[in-house]
Amino acid sequence: MDSFNNLIVVTLALGGVATGNGFNVLHHLAGNSPWFSGPEVTGISSEVPAECTVDMAAFISRHGSRYADNGAYREWANLSSRIHAANFTVQDRALDFLPSWKPVMEYPEQQIAQLSTTGYKELYDMGATYRLQYPDLYAYNTNFTLWSNYYYPSSRVRDSARLFARGYLGPNATELGSIFALNASNPRSFMNSLGSSDLCPAYDDDEGGHHHETWKHIFLPPIQARLNKLIHGDFQFTGDEVYIIPYLCGFETQIMGSSSPWCSIFTEEEILQYEYAQDLRYWYGNGLGTQIEKYMMLPVLDGLVQRFVDGPEATYTTSDTSTFVPPKLIAAFTNDGQISQLAAAIGVFDEETPLPATEISKNRLFKASNFVTMRGTIGFERLHCASEKAGNGTYLRIRLNDVVYPVAKCQSGPGKSCPLAEYQGLVKSKLNSAGNFSQICNVKDPAIPAGQNSATFFTDIALPFQTLVKP
């Protein structure tokens, strides 16, 4: 599997991206990194434990690599305008490109916020990889159902599901595949979509708030001063412009398919400081450092775990009384905010110490770069272990960008997996702690159903707020 997942890294790890000591800038940009298979930080083998089999699997993934959105492109264009209006020279070869730099998007009106060519590749590869990794979970040339957030601002999430389906199903994907795109803004979808926070008025992702800003004010000024000493004339970087340099590195590299010159500007230490800023952004924006934001994907997790508890052969009666047999591989696509919310819910970071805002927490397990990348993926495997040695029973294990992470408070099973029934209990306990979602969200809209605390869309494909999309 690693050969598939590392192909894009090999393609992109060109001059200025991977250094002589093996440090790869693209592995430290959090949500601005193209896909890569995560580092082995837990010491747990990704191989299926002896005498166990995977009889069900699931993943919830961010969309693939994309072009800049409107806000980011405006920042790029404004920076380019300032550069070209100035008269200056540079004193470092790493900045030689600067006087002539312009944004790499050739057709911004059409490309804004859409998947890039690297995104296409990531998703096709992902489909083929999952087909090879779990050959027993799909019968050749049969129908396959998957899900996506509809996400009205852009088609990139739906397109990610479409491209995955083509890689997974092959030439007959359009005939065999059915993608149910969930409209997270429809009141009837409250806590029953892949964008649960959309209908929560109290939800407020402040992008890390004062923790994020405190760290930016510590680490950015020295970088700004260092760079501006290398520029002579009437151009100087602002602090905000310095902060988007790693963003430009990640985006330009995957858009062009070759190393961006922006990747050579920050030192290794400075990149790690930027990476920590991104950790603060997610931890305190919509992760475990928040009050209600961390709960938003719990209903989806609860519905997914119930599907695992019901087992691979379960059938369901949908809301229109038809019968639905879900796939043994549950595939779903959404956005980075939901990946961060889900990471807060799954239990692998529950014993992490809150991240300080004034210094880097060097021994932290939580690194957004390892799972909120483009095509960042939180995966689940249901392990059926048939022998006493393997611990007779059914277990669950979690994989972030391929790497197995143990549940902090439940790792008694083979390969530090968690007994499935115990994991369901843990999720139910989290739901109880969260309370009534209508109340914590301060819902006032009478069209929003009360008491909806668990997602049903994985087992009901007749819901009124979903749209069928074909690959």
Q: Which residues does each PLM region occupy?
A:
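Fungal secretory targeting signals
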Residues: 1-22
